Amino acid sequence: MKVAILTQPLHTNYGGTLQAFALQYVIKSLGHEPETINYRKQLPNTSLIRKILSRIKQKIISGRIIYSFDHDEMKIISKYHDEFINKYIKYSDVVYDVGALKSKIISGGFHSIVVGSDQTWRPRYSPRIDSFFLDFLQGDESIKKISYASSFGTDVWEFDQIQTNKFKLLLKQFHFVSVREKSAVKLCMDKFDVQAEHVLDPTLLLEKDIYMNLLSAKPTEHKKNGIFNYVLDKSLEKKDIIKKCAKILQMPVFSSYPLSTHKESCTIEDFNDYIYPPIEEWISSFYYADYVITDSFHGTVFSIIFNKPFISVANEYRGKARFISLLELFGLEDRLVSNSNDINSTLLFSPINFEEVNLRLVELRKNSIHLLQMSLLN
């Protein structure tokens, strides 16, 4: 059976791309034909005057101007991600509006549509949030509607009352609802009166060997040891955390991320500062690391998959609930820190019982795959 997958646009987000890869991998292993729909927001055609006014405002507020990458620049910056997507993920032609999205689903011969995973139910991250509750298929019973590991990204309700009422009606038309966070189970019941199952992020459904096969298919020279720093928000507080950890652990720090993710001049002189390293290199960083510091949900996930000692830095803006829910599954709540005052030698040298973690993962993985399988069959 053909299965459409509706997730957030794939571009340079390591975790986002790998969860899309993993979900397709599992659905394919269950005997279906998955295709991820390349649904994204049409970039506005902003006038020159508006661009200038916006940059003046940025300069006044933040003291610097951030320029947007144009289409050709993005192709260069994301070339390794695009290479991975083209090789491993069946991705449709780009769809910009809800009419084209509906036409793609209806004419594509899909038996089911799966919304997820990642923060598909978070307004600030998803293009036209109504689409991720499948409003364009309202009343259509010919296509099975499923959510797998969808996430609100936070335990704070971000929908207004009109949206809440609308999405409540839409979600009741889903044949199966599952979410990635424990807090989301409660939100679905309290706000939508819908019973949701708590399941694993797709990346945790795959055994480590599958990721190792990706590395074998594209060997990398990136074989650094020490502390893998995968911290997305470069605040002073987080820099202090990294320095303190390096000092206590007596380890060098390495990264696998562009030197710059913001364009602060009209033209780019050296693209090497902006290019996102290959996904295989990012995965290998976990494999070779002796320790991991991250403020990323998927950074935490891959630390667990590769059995690496780690600390996760709480990210209030990106959504702390995601980390709490994930770590509670494995009894690792003590690995979550908020600031440099939480860092000490007792925490950093405290061993993680990965034997127990791995046993829990096997059971959770088995249950999540079973629920996904049943949702596609029933």
Protein language model features and the residues they cover:
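Active-site anion-handling motifs in enzyme catalytic cores
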Residues: 1-378
